[in-house]
Amino acid sequence: MLKFLNLTSTSLVLTSAYNVQNIYLAELLISNRIQFHKRLHQQRTAHKVTSPPSQRPQNSETKSDSQNRS
């Protein structure tokens, strides 16, 4: 009986260690995924090409609207 209890407690300790390791790996994965998406967002916003203010339309008027007015 003592041998069985000893094996059971060893098994529980190993299972606990395994679960702690899995939790750590899951947290690491989530952390890496968050960092990846932050970097991806930064890259996307950095690569957006914006025209200088002088070339931007001042209102939502399109080219055809301005031609129709002329």
UniProtKB/Swiss-Prot annotation:
Disordered: annotated segments: 40-70
Biological classification of the source: Viruses, Monodnaviria, Sangervirae, Phixviricota, Malgrandaviricetes
Protein's name according to its UniProt entry: Uncharacterized protein X
Comp. bias regions, Polar residues: 51-61
Source organism superkingdom: Viruses
Species this protein is from: Bdellovibrio phage phiMH2K
